[in-house]
């Protein structure tokens, strides 16, 4: 229902307009207070790059963060990553991730980024505290914040917005009548706009999510996902239909698709109940970091990597690396 409201297919969004105006008024006032200097943002001693969204829901932000970390690492830059840690609850913050840190403590996206890149990752509701924790423990040259475009308490040097190229900005209204955290005009002030799927507009960087080989959660074995049979697909991400469409495009045709809430806690019994005899469970990599500890032999995940097109990605990377002392 919420997707139909935000896309404009349902007229129920009109009933939510008073709340949206209130949201827009409050969020605009917060940003203006920092812009006018009425509130002070904390500035880190190293450059900060924010990768975020203008809309609620999954846009492909985490693959972009991983892409950016890996590209900077390839250029010899020491990178740290901070996050709010949605879906996790630590005993104390800030929490600096270790190989033993669980998704219940840190959230699924920070654990995924940590496992994929090996970069230092810290989570905290207050991003500045997470940055300070990384700087105290690691000699990093730059910080990337996973989400946090609207977290103005942390000063930033570069702002990158990730846009779903198919859904774009829906009906264009602020939450909850629409998907917008900020107005689309905010794009005029960011350094780069990356468009995941669909058709990028002038000045935007086109991106596609490229699937790799399916990986078995227990053994690490790899195979073409189309070779798996009797698939049950599970996706606990911001926009599950994107994952199901990716499986179809790979030639894997699930018998059943199970959409879950983003950052949803996954109990072993609940996941096991999804798969019948002779069936194979295929999930996102973000779900896999939550399920690996209790995975069955017939559980697989499909990793995806961000593929950015054109000359703009290199120019963006050059701009970012030029900030590193």
Swiss-Prot record:
Question: Kind of enzyme, top EC level?
Answer: transferase
Please give the SUPFAM superfamilies that the UniProt record associates with this protein.
Answer: P-loop containing nucleoside triphosphate hydrolases
Reaction(s) catalysed (UniProt annotation): a lipid A disaccharide + ATP = a lipid IVA + ADP + H(+)
- A single Pfam family, by name? LpxK
Q: Name one GO biological process term.
A: lipopolysaccharide core region biosynthetic process
Keyword annotations from UniProtKB, A to Z: ATP-binding, Kinase, Lipid A biosynthesis, Lipid biosynthesis, Lipid metabolism, Nucleotide-binding, Transferase
Under InterPro entries, the record lists: LpxK, P-loop_NTPase
Q: Which residues bind ATP?
A: 55-62
Tell me the GO molecular function terms. ATP binding; tetraacyldisaccharide 4'-kinase activity
Q: What is its EC number?
A: 2.7.1.130
ATP-binding listed as a keyword: yes
What's a GO cellular component annotated to this UniProt protein? plasma membrane
Coiled-coil residues: none
Q: In which pathway does it act?
A: Glycolipid biosynthesis; lipid IV(A) biosynthesis; lipid IV(A) from (3R)-3-hydroxytetradecanoyl-[acyl-carrier-protein] and UDP-N-acetyl-alpha-D-glucosamine: step 6/6
Under PANTHER family, the record lists: TETRAACYLDISACCHARIDE 4'-KINASE (PTHR42724), TETRAACYLDISACCHARIDE 4'-KINASE, MITOCHONDRIAL-RELATED (PTHR42724:SF1)
What protein family is recorded?
Belongs to the LpxK family.
HAMAP family linked to this entry: LpxK
Could you tell me what this protein does? Answer: Transfers the gamma-phosphate of ATP to the 4'-position of a tetraacyldisaccharide 1-phosphate intermediate (termed DS-1-P) to form tetraacyldisaccharide 1,4'-bis-phosphate (lipid IVA).
Protein name per its UniProtKB record:
Tetraacyldisaccharide 4'-kinase
**Where does this protein come from, organism-wise?**
Salmonella paratyphi A (strain AKU_12601)
The organism's taxonomy opens as: Bacteria, Pseudomonadati, Pseudomonadota, Gammaproteobacteria, Enterobacterales
